[in-house]
């Protein structure tokens, strides 16, 4: 009997596209499961998506891991996989929850609701999926759950086209607005010296800070990430390490040499493919090398493309098929 999987398409955090849709399409290509696509927070938008009756009523409760069981609103499925804010209860089948954003589990952005929600889901038998080993350690520590309840499967990174003849210095800012403001003058000077410009991919609040500081920087919304990458000569991924570095990996896939901070997750996932800096004072010198050294760039492009294959949608789909089967076997044993 074919494995039937309920997949929530509303869980993507990506600026490059919907990673859950990419995962769904890749799962379909395997031919190893039957997908029931649904949306937990928004209305169904395609013919192949299942409409959830009274979704607007249940959705606020699902954010607390309460309310009606999701499989009561779906055709028969063997397992349900969600990755966003909703963790709906299930009845007599397992739930898999991808935890791709660690900000609600951390210090100043610590969100009691999210922590309670995830703990409640685990108490009911849910399996949590972290995007990296370092992220799994943080999830286990903060939630206080058993190591056996957390597994590691990287998310699908949306496909991007190869970048040719890019000229911009593109900086992706995630959770480190003040650091970027501090680095901005030297990045602007570098770009001017090399006949380029700085393009910052930023949240609305970060964009406002950049403009209020009068910085000569082109700011673009996250939804423009794909277009920005298409014109990049070098990408700098500035992150607090709370989320999977999908933009950096997409840059590697596109053949754009990439520089990133040596956070724990970046060392785990990007070392050997991107240039990692351990001190923010190293950024200018490292950037010069990555920008101007032809042989270094060629090596980085080859290594980056090789690494990006590990996070392609088809790779993620194979890993998730194995996880679905393992979780269903454990549930029915």
Predicted regions and their residues:
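Carbohydrate transferase catalytic cores enriched for Leloir-type hexosyltransferases
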Residues: 1-333
């Amino acid at each position: 009997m074919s494995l039937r999987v309920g997949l929530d398409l509303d869980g993507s955090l990506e600026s490059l596209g919907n990673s859950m849709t990419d995962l769904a399409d890749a799962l379909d290509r395997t031919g190893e499961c039957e997908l029931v696509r649904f949306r937990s927070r928004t209305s169904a938008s395609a013919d192949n998506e299942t409409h959830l009756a009274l979704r607007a009523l249940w959705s606020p409760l699902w954010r607390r891991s309460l309310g009606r069981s999701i499989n009561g609103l779906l055709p028969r499925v063997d397992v349900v996989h969600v990755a966003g804010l909703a963790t709906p209860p299930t009845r007599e089948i397992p739930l898999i929850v991808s935890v791709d954003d660690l900000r609600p589990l951390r210090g100043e952005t610590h969100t009691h609701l999210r922590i309670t929600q995830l703990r409640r889901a685990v108490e009911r038998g849910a399996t949590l999926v972290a995007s990296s080993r370092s992220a799994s350690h943080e999830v286990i520590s903060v939630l206080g759950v058993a190591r056996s309840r957390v597994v590691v499967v990287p998310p699908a990174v949306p496909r991007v086209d190869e970048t040719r003849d890019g000229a911009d210095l593109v900086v992706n800012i995630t959770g480190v607005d003040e650091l970027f403001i501090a680095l901005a003058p030297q990045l602007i000077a570098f770009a001017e010296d090399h006949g380029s410009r700085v393009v910052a991919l930023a949240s609305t609040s970060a964009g406002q800070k950049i403009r209020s500081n009068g910085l000569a920087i082109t700011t673009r919304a996250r939804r423009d990430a794909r277009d920005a990458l298409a014109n990049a000569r070098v990408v700098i991924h500035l992150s607090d390490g709370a989320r999977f570095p999908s933009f950096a990996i997409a840059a590697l896939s596109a053949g754009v040499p990439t520089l990133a901070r040596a956070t724990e997750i970046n060392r785990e996932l990007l070392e050997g493919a991107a240039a990692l800096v351990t001190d923010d004072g190293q950024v200018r010198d490292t950037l010069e090398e990555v920008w101007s050294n032809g042989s270094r760039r060629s090596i980085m492009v080859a290594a980056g493309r090789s690494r990006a294959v590990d996070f392609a949608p088809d790779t993620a789909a194979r890993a998730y098929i194995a996880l679905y089967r393992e979780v269903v076997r454990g549930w029915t044993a």
